[in-house]
Amino acid sequence: MSLRTLPTITPLALTCAIMMAATSFATAEPTQWKRQGWKTDFSKTSIKFAEILSGGPPKDGIPSIDQPIFKPVAANTDVGGKEPVVSLAIDGDARAYPLRILIWHEIVNDTIAGMPVTVTYCPLCNSAIAFDRRVDGQTLDFGTTGKLRNSDLVMYDRATESWWQQFTGEAIVGEMLGKSLKMLPARLESLGQFKTRHPDGKILVPNNPTMRRYGQNPYVGYDSAAKPFLYSGSMPEGINPMARVVAIRNADTSFAVALSLLREKRTLAHAGVTLTWQPGQNSALDTQNIGSGRDVGTVSAFIAGANDATTPIPYDVTFAFVFHAFHPNRTIRIK
């Protein structure tokens, strides 16, 4: 039984399931993966295969959404106003992807205003990132491998079956090794905030409303856990590994700021980037009912220009251990 396909799970059951998964799959390597049907070129890798663990599901066991269905956000009656959504707007086409859906599917392959995009969410990292899914002129479709590295979702493209790290957007195994996906300036915000900014926007709805228990959180209490699951790396210093941080990774700089600090200051400038925080967004990883989760607020990130112009930039509200795992030489600003 997969911890990421359970209809609901208690913290104790989740811990047991993860310990079983870690024990069962710690020795997985290319020979076994090939027996599972993978056509990946495992001779090309930038990582140690021992870093890869299985979260339980097989390839595509967590099904991506490849033919997304939307309805006008004004017609929504299912998603609560404070529930978290990943929002992305391109050339006036604004779309909201509720975490109540993404928590069960993790990947949505979509096209917005002619741009092929993939919208992703890794629950164990609380990492919500959108990418342009074009690489060297080729449009890729992404699926779930069922595997994790540093507790983070490992995706694969269906053209070459190369494996991609969701948190970085980089191909880590296979023919596409060394290629990177361009991150897009998506925002994790409440549905109410999205609706205010984009009253004519669209919201993703389930292809099959009975396929999963949409609106329910299968990781109850995870963001209050003492330590992360399926992670054996070093922990960040001076901050709880499960504390939320705002991670900025653009062409000029990579840094992280503790969400608690931003929440206290409301507005904070760092390395030329302005961050803001406002209340009104539920945690998707707190209570069983996502709509009842505690308020963790909404972050925006932008670069200020001339005449009060602002340019949104990609950011991520993730856990401190995740940023540390992928950027061990970077410090997290806590004061």
Language-model segments: residues:
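Bacterial N-terminal signal peptides that target proteins for export
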Residues: 2-13
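Mid-to-C-terminal functional-domain signal that highlights helix-capping/loop sites
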Residues: 27-335
